[in-house]
């Protein structure tokens, strides 16, 4: 499925979604796994 690596000032998180939560300073790197 599509997974996004969501980076913030608190660390890196992986979400099994097509995008990261908006409006919280996340950077998005998505890939198909």
Swiss-Prot record:
Q: List all disulphide bridges recorded for this chain.
A: 6-30
Which keywords are on file for this protein?
Answer: Disulfide bond, Ion channel impairing toxin, Nematocyst, Potassium channel impairing toxin, Secreted, Toxin, Voltage-gated potassium channel impairing toxin
Q: Record's GO cellular component, any one?
A: nematocyst
An example of a GO molecular function for this protein is:
potassium channel regulator activity
Where does it mainly reside?
secreted
Which Pfam families has this protein been placed in? Defensin_4 (PF07936)
Q: What does this protein do?
A: Potently and reversibly blocks mammalian Kv11/KCNH/ERG voltage-gated potassium channels. Acts as a gating-modifier toxin that shifts the voltage-dependence of ERG activation in the positive direction and suppresses its current amplitudes elicited by strong depolarizing pulses that maximally activate the channels.
- Sequence similarity: Belongs to the sea anemone type 3 (BDS) potassium channel toxin family.
Record-given protein name: Toxin BcV
UniProt lineage: Eukaryota, Metazoa, Cnidaria, Anthozoa, Hexacorallia
């Amino acid at each position: 499925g599509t997974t996004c690596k969501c980076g913030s000032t608190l660390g890196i998180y992986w979400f099994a979604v097509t995008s990261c939560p908006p409006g919280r300073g996340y950077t998005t790197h998505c890939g198909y796994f």
